[in-house]
């Protein structure tokens, strides 16, 4: 909540500053606020993930200030700075899923079968660099982005299942559904600080000042470092954003 309030104050401050100073006529400034929905997921559903039991929508917000310049004909360039949150919470059923966890104060590793809950939360500063194409009141855009994570969490627990230590034929460790009998894990320290990807989207100007926008961002780097091997599949951040925008100039 503190981050949200601070972000709103920052965005309001930038907007007021932009209206108080002289902005070159060739530049278009836009303030944005949106909602992110998506997940960190592997490309394709691996055989070890048998079923998605639930997906919990969390409060993912995005604030941004962009500057766009028309260069030739209908083509232009857009960049800016965004403060955004990308998070998820899922419950899945897995089989022979490689995991490392803590149960009863002891760290164990092996092949897990049963229910698994994962929570991921990322706050980041994102810099997009996008080509734009203007078509009437529409502005189509696409290009790469880079994000720096200021906050990163990836944790969860397993329950109603069992772990075979070492390999699928190893000693069996039962997992219950109460806090003392579940296995917990935390891989936040193994997450990358920097993320790279591509962003495709469109802005629609409804009035002279207000409009709507939608974007799809697809991470090209996994959320964990390449040296992280506990989860066998690489997890990519894939999110869509919808929101409103205000043309500062």
Where are these regions (language model features)?
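Bacterial Sec-dependent N-terminal signal peptides
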Residues: 1-32, 131, 244-248
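Short glycine/proline- and aromatic-enriched beta-strand/turn motifs that initiate or cap beta-hairpins
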Residues: 20-68, 147, 191, 247-249
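Hydrophobic, lipid-facing positions within transmembrane beta-strands of outer-membrane proteins
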Residues: 29, 59-65, 123-129, 196-200, ...
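Transmembrane beta-strands of outer-membrane beta-barrel pores
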Residues: 35-39, 83-87, 135-137, 146-152, ...
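Extracellular/periplasm-exposed beta-strand and loop segments of Gram-negative cell-envelope proteins
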Residues: 39-58, 86-122, 149-195, 221-239
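Repeated loop/turn-to-beta-strand initiation elements of outer-membrane beta-barrel proteins
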Residues: 74-77, 137-140, 208-214
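A hydrophobic membrane-anchoring alpha-helix module
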Residues: 203-205, 209-221
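Outer-membrane beta-barrel "beta-signal"
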Residues: 204, 236-249
């Amino acid at each position: 909540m503190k981050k949200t309030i601070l972000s709103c104050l920052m965005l309001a401050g930038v907007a007021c500053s932009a209206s108080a100073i002289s902005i070159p006529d060739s530049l278009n400034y836009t303030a944005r606020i949106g909602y992110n929905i998506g997940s960190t997921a592997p490309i394709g559903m691996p055989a070890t993930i048998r079923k998605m039991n639930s997906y919990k929508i969390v409060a993912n917000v995005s604030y941004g200030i962009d500057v766009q310049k028309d260069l030739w004909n209908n083509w232009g360039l857009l960049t800016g700075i965004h403060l955004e949150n990308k998070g998820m919470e899922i419950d899945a059923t897995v089989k022979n899923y490689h995991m490392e966890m803590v149960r009863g104060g002891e760290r164990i590793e092996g092949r897990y079968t049963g229910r698994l809950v994962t929570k991921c939360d990322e706050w980041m500063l994102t810099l997009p660099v996008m080509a734009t194409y203007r078509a009437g009141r529409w502005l189509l855009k696409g290009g790469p982005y880079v994000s720096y994570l200021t906050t990163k969490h990836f944790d969860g627990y397993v329950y109603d299942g069992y772990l075979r230590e070492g390999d699928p034929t190893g000693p069996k460790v039962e997992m219950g559904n109460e806090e003392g009998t579940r296995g917990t894990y935390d891989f936040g320290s193994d997450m990358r600080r920097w993320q790279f990807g591509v962003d495709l989207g469109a802005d629609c100007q409804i009035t002279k000042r207000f409009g709507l926008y939608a974007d799809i961002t697809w991470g090209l780097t996994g959320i964990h470092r390449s040296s992280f091997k506990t989860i066998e599949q690489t997890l990519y951040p894939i999110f869509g954003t919808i929101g409103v925008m205000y043309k500062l100039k």
